[in-house]
């Protein structure tokens, strides 16, 4: 049943049914009464004095005026200014005929009679008056002194003025026990934003002015209470709205009436003494009204007396909701300020405000206290406080109040057109206020025209007197369910704030958008229990909430009794969580633990219960209920305490017309993805919607940057490849063909395998240390003249069989390093070149790669037996192993040569220390350039041969 809506979280403001009306004085002078033993002024008869600032032609309701009144012997000078923003341009008035047909009229653009102002030379003062039928209103001098002024009945020009505390009603209360401050802090957790939100509202967005387009309704009993006078009834409702607008200005919120309706021939919905049934009946009627008259919030003023002390009822956090943005208020006072305080309180609940704790309100109880106090002040509260401001900010940050950013169009503002009033109206190009206060460089204040060259003067889509280009972002997407808005290029104002339609999936399909918010069980559990909490299994909800008692229920019914949850609605009752914390975050809340058996193991289900007074138990629903808009199953959402199919949102039907390329906004129009054009997202375009403006074209900057980077990388790779090819070609030339300074600088591209199993002809050729790393041998370079022919091997190189076997490593090393004359390399002074004039540059650091490929076949046919098999040669005693038997004294000469057209792979044929054929041998010496120079050593008795096999190889 709708009356038990768990997520609505209703708060009731309880006051007295009827205050004591101050007794009017029939004679001029003072009327005193006794209160607490001391005489005090009850009321005073005065005649206010008007002084206008207009031209000599006197207006009935001037734009600005000065009013002088006497109060307790003190003259108060009131500086008044007409509240020109009270009525929206679409303001209408509706009444009904005896047959029940509505009659709607648009009020003429006449001077209205509702003012705001201050007391001259008095800080923090405030004045709210109407001058339609005499002067009636509230004069606030300080936080503890205020006066009420009203016309004396049946008198011309005479008025009563008295202190506001003499309107004191019997005290009432609502909701929480406001003496416990922590209760409020816990309730605030419900309006905090989840940590996963992509983006929070900017501070300037929170501080910017918000606008509530209000629709007021007076029921049939209220009409009868005002003596069936339509004008009197309408005047009272407008006066109420004027008060509420003044109250909310301190929160940067303006109240603009878009419509007023009087039920002159019976009620249009069920109105009874039960506030619950009256509220849900009125909200149901209001949903039908939305199709005919757009508004943000609707309030019912009824002459019905509710049960007990209840005089107001409204859902919590419901502002802008299609289904719940509204409230019902009982007219419990003949003075409009009493009903205005009640309506401001109930609208505060719509804004997400809970009741004040004891330390929030600084206004004295004697002057009424604060509007959101749980108990009434004396006589009526008139101010909000810092706690209310913080609650409002949290609500806006969580996604609430999405409809409040758009300012009502003031081009046909009710109350008349005038250059200098600060509102752009028909016939005006701009309006920056009076000449002395205008500081807009784009606007001529004297005649409300744009200065030469200016295209605009106001609005977020106007920059330096020029309209911003179409597609310029003027309002960012604040959170998941919000939508961005873009300048149209035709208007200086940003389009109305739109958001995704209720029922649109969010949070990766784990939740649904509702009223601009995306709520999950996980978030609510963490708000109740702190970080780490998570929702309990579904079985916990089913076992606990079917009880229908204080600890497990689906809200309350029309009579205020706890309602059992049907199995399908169990996840919309008391929320069940799992947490390791000992108790909930709120000090007045206690854990309600239930243990169930699931799959053979125990599961702990943790709910919460907040202790409240007996009078509060029936006035406010449990805040531990699952919030409206929470996903309770596939295509199902919690709504009014029930798990309902999302089809009633009509999201699916609206989404089909977007052709899968967009989402529906709250105006049921498609907001297209980039690349598709509105209104149906079925043709190429830039995205956006007909409501939010066109999205900017996709920027080609990233594409161009990507192409340029790719071209640059490709060019670098090609340059590196070209350099390597050139190095390979230069490295394969003879050293004799290169300048001496460049011979060894191009040897880096040669590859040397570090693997003994490479498949070379001589697998014993290794350039590795025992640790598997190449060992660099540094020996002086052996130089020869460029004209000197390459050495030849001895003529008998190929005779006599194989060369002698190589020596063991330690003997070979000893023989090479022996200082004896037989091991020295002969050099002559004539063969030496002069030392270089400058040191030889170091070899470049080149990467030496491995080559595991098979060697190339020889380019020339090899002889039949180029290397005969080895045979042991006799060694006479004392003969050097490097000399053949019978040789004379050793007179060897070193010869270094690089075979023509030799490849790096062929250079590996020779191993350092290998004995040469017919007594010759190849050996390795170090050079200064870290190269291995394979040197052919010839014996003196042998003739050099034309061919050789010793090569210059890389280190």
UniProtKB/Swiss-Prot annotation:
Residues 210-408 form the Peptidase M12B domain. Residues 721-955 are cytoplasmic. Residues 1-25 form the signal peptide. It comes from the Eukaryota. The chain crosses the membrane at residues 700-720. Residues 416-502 form the Disintegrin domain. Residues 650-682 form the EGF-like domain. Residues 26-202 form a propeptide. The keyword Thylakoid does not apply. Pfam families: ADAM_CR, Disintegrin, Pep_M12B_propep, Reprolysin. GO terms for biological process: amyloid precursor protein catabolic process; membrane protein ectodomain proteolysis; placenta development; positive regulation of cell-cell adhesion mediated by cadherin; positive regulation of gene expression; protein processing. Binds 1 zinc ion per subunit. Coiled coil: none annotated. Disulfide bonds join 320-403, 360-387, 361-370, 474-494, 654-664, 658-670, 672-681. The precursor is cleaved by a furin endopeptidase. A motif (SH3-binding) lies at residues 833-844. Expressed in many normal organ tissues and several cancer cell lines. InterPro entries: ADAM_Cys-rich, Disintegrin_CS, Disintegrin_dom, Disintegrin_dom_sf, EGF-like_dom, MetalloPept_cat_dom_sf, Peptidase_M12B, Peptidase_M12B_N. The active site is at 346. Zn(2+) binds at residues 132, 345, 349, 355. It is found in: Membrane. It is a single-pass type I membrane protein. Participates in the proteolytic processing of beta-type neuregulin isoforms which are involved in neurogenesis and synaptogenesis, suggesting a regulatory role in glial cell. Also cleaves alpha-2 macroglobulin. May be involved in osteoblast differentiation and/or osteoblast activity in bone. PANTHER family: ADAM A DISINTEGRIN AND METALLOPROTEASE DOMAIN, DISINTEGRIN AND METALLOPROTEINASE DOMAIN-CONTAINING PROTEIN 19. This is Disintegrin and metalloproteinase domain-containing protein 19. It comes from Homo sapiens (Human). The lineage of its organism: Eukaryota, Metazoa, Chordata, Craniata, Vertebrata.
């Amino acid at each position: 049943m709708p009356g038990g809506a768990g997520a609505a979280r209703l708060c009731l403001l309880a006051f007295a049914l009827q205050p004591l009306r101050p007794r009017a004085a029939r004679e001029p002078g003072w009327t005193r009464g006794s209160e607490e033993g001391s005489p005090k002024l009850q009321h005073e008869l005065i005649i206010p004095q008007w002084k206008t600032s207009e031209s000599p032609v006197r207006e009935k309701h001037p734009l600005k005026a000065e009013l002088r009144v006497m109060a307790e012997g003190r003259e108060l000078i009131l500086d008044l200014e007409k509240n020109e923003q009270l009525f929206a341009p679409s303001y209408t008035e509706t009444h009904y005929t005896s047959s029940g047909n509505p009659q709607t009229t648009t009020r003429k653009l006449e001077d209205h009679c509702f003012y705001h102002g201050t007391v001259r030379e008095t800080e923090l003062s405030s004045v709210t008056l109407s001058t339609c039928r005499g002067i009636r209103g509230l004069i606030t001098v300080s936080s503890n002194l205020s006066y009420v002024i009203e016309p004396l009945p049946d008198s011309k020009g005479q008025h009563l003025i008295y202190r506001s505390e003499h309107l004191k009603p019997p005290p009432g209360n609502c909701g929480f026990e406001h003496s416990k401050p922590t209760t409020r802090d816990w309730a605030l957790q419900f309006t905090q934003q989840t940590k996963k939100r992509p983006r929070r509202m900017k501070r300037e967005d929170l501080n910017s002015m918000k606008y509530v387009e209000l629709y007021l309704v007076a029921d049939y009993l209220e009409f009868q209470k005002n003596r069936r006078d339509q004008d009197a009834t309408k005047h009272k409702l407008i006066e109420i709205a004027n008060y509420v607008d003044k109250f909310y200005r301190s929160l940067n919120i303006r109240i603009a009436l878009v419509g007023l309706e009087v039920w002159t021939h019976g009620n249009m919905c069920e109105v009874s003494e039960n506030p619950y049934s009256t509220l849900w009946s009125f909200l149901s009627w209001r949903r039908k009204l939305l199709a005919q008259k757009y508004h943000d919030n609707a309030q019912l003023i009824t002459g019905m007396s509710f049960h007990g002390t209840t005089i107001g009822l409204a859902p919590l956090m419901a502002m802008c909701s299609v289904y719940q943005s509204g409230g019902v208020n009982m007219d419990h006072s003949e003075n409009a300020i009493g009903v205005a305080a009640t309506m401001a309180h109930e609208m505060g609940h719509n804004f997400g405000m809970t009741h004040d704790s004891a330390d929030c309100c600084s206004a004295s109880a004697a002057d009424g206290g604060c509007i959101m106090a749980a108990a009434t002040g004396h006589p009526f509260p008139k101010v909000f406080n810092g706690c209310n401001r913080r609650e409002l900010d949290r609500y806006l940050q969580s996604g609430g109040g999405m409809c409040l950013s758009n300012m009502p169009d003031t081009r046909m503002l009710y109350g008349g057109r005038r250059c200098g009033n600060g509102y752009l109206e028909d016939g005006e190009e701009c309006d920056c206020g009076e000449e002395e206060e205008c500081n807009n460089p784009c606007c001529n204040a004297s005649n409300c025209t744009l200065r030469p060259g200016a295209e605009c003067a106001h609005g977020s889509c106007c920059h330096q007197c020029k309209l911003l280009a179409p597609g310029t972002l003027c309002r960012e997407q604040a959170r998941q369910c919000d939508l961005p808005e873009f300048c149209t290029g035709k208007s200086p104002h940003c389009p109305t704030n739109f958001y995704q339609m209720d029922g649109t999936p969010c949070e990766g399909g784990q939740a649904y958008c509702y009223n601009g918010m995306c709520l999950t069980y996980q978030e609510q559990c963490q708000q109740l229990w702190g970080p780490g909490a998570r929702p309990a299994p579904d079985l916990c909800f089913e076992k606990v909430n079917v009880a229908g008692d204080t600890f497990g229920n689906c809200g309350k019914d029309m009579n205020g009794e706890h309602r059992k949850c049907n199995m399908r609605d169990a996840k919309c009752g008391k929320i069940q969580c799992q947490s390791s914390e000992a108790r909930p975050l709120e000090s007045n809340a206690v854990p309600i633990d239930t243990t169930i058996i699931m799959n053979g193991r125990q599961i702990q289900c943790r709910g919460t219960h907040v202790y409240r007074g007996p009078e509060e138990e029936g006035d406010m629903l449990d805040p531990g209920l699952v919030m409206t808009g929470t996903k309770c199953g596939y295509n199902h959402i919690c709504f009014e305490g029930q798990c309902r199919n999302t089809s009633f949102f009509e999201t699916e039907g609206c989404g089909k017309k977007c052709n899968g390329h967009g989402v529906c906004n709250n105006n049921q129009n498609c907001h297209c993805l980039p690349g598709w054009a509105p209104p149906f997202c079925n043709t190429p375009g830039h995205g956006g919607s007909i409501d939010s403006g066109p999205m900017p074209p996709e920027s080609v900057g990233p594409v161009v940057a990507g192409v340029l980077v790719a071209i640059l990388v490709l060019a670098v790779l090609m340059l590196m490849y070209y350099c390597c090819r050139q190095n390979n070609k230069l490295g394969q030339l003879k050293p004799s063909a290169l300048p001496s300074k460049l011979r060894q600088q191009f040897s880096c591209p040669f590859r040397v395998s570090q693997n003994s199993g490479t498949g070379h002809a001589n697998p014993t050729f290794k350039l590795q240390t025992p640790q598997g790393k190449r060992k660099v041998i540094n020996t002086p370079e052996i130089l020869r003249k460029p004209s000197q022919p390459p050495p030849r091997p001895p003529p008998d190189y190929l005779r006599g069989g194989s060369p002698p076997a190589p020596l063991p490593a330690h003997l070979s090393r000893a023989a090479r390093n022996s200082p004896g004359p037989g091991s020295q390399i002969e050099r002559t002074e004539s063969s030496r070149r002069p030392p270089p004039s400058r040191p030889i540059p170091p070899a470049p650091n080149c990467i030496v790669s491995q080559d595991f490929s098979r060697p190339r076949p020889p380019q020339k046919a090899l002889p039949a037996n180029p290397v005969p098999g080895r045979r042991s040669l006799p060694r006479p005693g004392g003969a050097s192993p490097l000399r053949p038997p019978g040789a004379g004294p050793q007179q060897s000469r070193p010869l270094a040569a690089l075979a023509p057209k030799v490849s790096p792979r062929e250079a590996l044929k020779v191993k350092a220390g290998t004995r040469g054929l017919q007594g010759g041998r190849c050996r390795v010496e170090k050079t200064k350039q870290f190269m291995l120079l394979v040197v052919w050593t010839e014996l003196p008795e042998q003739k050099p041969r034309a061919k050789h096999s010793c090569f210059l190889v890389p280190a």
